[in-house]
């Protein structure tokens, strides 16, 4: 069962109106105070700030739910975890990725196991081993890894693939000893 609740936006939306008023007052004050000084700078500065917001939103597309800001440089898992990052929004991408690579089985323990029952196209799923990567495909939910350190081996290996913003994947050929990096 998946959830359509967006906990981050749900709690922030009520303050947007107040922030917009404050930003408008600030912009008007800035324009008034700089009317005699730096006249060539004030309008480009305001359009630059507005453009920054537009570009920031466009770069986050379509991952608005897991977007944080430019400081994270696309690695929000280094700053936030749990429901701040993963609401199951990338589960369809995980299923599509596994189908694309022809996986028939995957070692995977999602942050919320009910995500597997939400109708996503997955091959056979076996629980991840905490100590060792399994032969074949391994997928790690960043939310589960950051909150529960499960699986423990994930932090010792650079991911081979990033699926959306909330999952990592590796492939280890049968008989191959996964290397610690």
Language-model region placement:
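Signature aromatic-anchored transmembrane alpha helix within multi-pass, membrane-resident enzymes
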Residues: 26-63
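Transmembrane-helix signature of polytopic, lipid-linked glycan biosynthesis machinery
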Residues: 1-8, 58-61
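Hydrophobic/aromatic-rich transmembrane helices and adjacent perimembrane loops
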Residues: 5-30, 170
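Conserved short-loop catalytic and cofactor-binding motifs
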Residues: 2, 11, 82
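Helicase-core coupling region on the C-terminal RecA-like lobe
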Residues: 57-75
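C-terminal luminal/periplasmic domains and tails of membrane-associated envelope-modifying transferases
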Residues: 69-181
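Alpha-helix capping/termination and helix-coil
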Residues: 18-22, 31-34, 52, 98, ...
């Amino acid at each position: 069962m998946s959830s359509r609740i967006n906990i981050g936006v749900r709690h922030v939306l009520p303050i947007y109106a107040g922030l917009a008023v404050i930003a408008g007052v600030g912009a008007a004050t800035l324009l008034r105070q700089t009317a005699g000084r730096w006249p060539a700078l004030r309008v480009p500065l305001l359009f630059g700030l507005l453009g920054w917001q537009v570009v920031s939103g466009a770069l986050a597309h379509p991952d608005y739910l897991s977007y944080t800001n430019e400081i994270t440089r696309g690695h929000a898992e280094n700053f936030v975890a749990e429901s701040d990052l993963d609401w199951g929004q990338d589960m369809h991408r995980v299923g599509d990725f596994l189908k694309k690579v022809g996986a028939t089985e995957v070692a995977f323990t999602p942050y919320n196991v009910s995500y597997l029952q939400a109708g996503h196209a997955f091959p056979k799923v076996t629980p991840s081993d905490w100590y060792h990567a399994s032969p074949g495909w391994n997928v790690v939910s960043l939310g589960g890894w950051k909150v529960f350190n499960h699986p423990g081996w994930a932090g010792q290996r650079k991911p081979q693939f990033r699926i959306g913003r909330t999952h990592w994947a590796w492939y280890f050929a049968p008989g191959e000893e996964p290397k610690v990096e």
